[in-house]
């Protein structure tokens, strides 16, 4: 391999807004600030909620409920 053509691979710290600190290595060259991580994201914490805004699911079921999974007739 040629010398001096590859970026430096350095230790960095990624800090989440929840306070979780992740130490890793990267070529980015500076520390990162994260909005979410696996410690605070609802998908990973099991606190994920399904929001039915304005009864849209009910309205969809009324319009297309009989057609879904049923036989055409």
Swiss-Prot record:
Alphabetized GO MF terms: metal ion binding; rRNA binding; structural constituent of ribosome
Cofactor: Zn(2+)
Positions bound to Zn(2+): 16, 18, 37, 40
Protein's UniProt keywords contain RNA-binding: yes
InterPro entries: Ribosomal_bL28/bL31-like_sf, Ribosomal_bL31, Ribosomal_bL31_A, Ribosomal_bL31_sf
Superkingdom: Bacteria
One BP annotation, GO: translation
SUPFAM superfamilies xref list: L28p-like
Keywords: Metal-binding, Ribonucleoprotein, Ribosomal protein, RNA-binding, rRNA-binding, Zinc
A family per Pfam: Ribosomal_L31
GO cellular component: ribonucleoprotein complex; ribosome
Gene3D superfamilies: Ribosomal protein L31 (4.10.830.30)
Binding note for cofactor: Binds 1 zinc ion per subunit.
Quaternary state and interactors: Part of the 50S ribosomal subunit.
Function: Binds the 23S rRNA.
Family stated for the protein in its record: Belongs to the bacterial ribosomal protein bL31 family. Type A subfamily.
Protein name listed in UniProt: Large ribosomal subunit protein bL31
Organism: Marinobacter nauticus (strain ATCC 700491 / DSM 11845 / VT8)
């Amino acid at each position: 391999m040629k010398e001096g053509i590859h970026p430096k691979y350095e230790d960095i710290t990624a800090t989440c807004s929840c306070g979780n600190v992740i130490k890793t290595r990267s070529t980015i060259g500076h520390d990162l600030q994260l909005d979410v991580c696996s410690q605070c994201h609802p998908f990973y914490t099991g606190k994920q909620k399904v929001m039915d805004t304005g009864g849209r699911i009910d309205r969809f079921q009324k319009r297309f409920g009989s057609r879904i999974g049923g036989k055409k007739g």
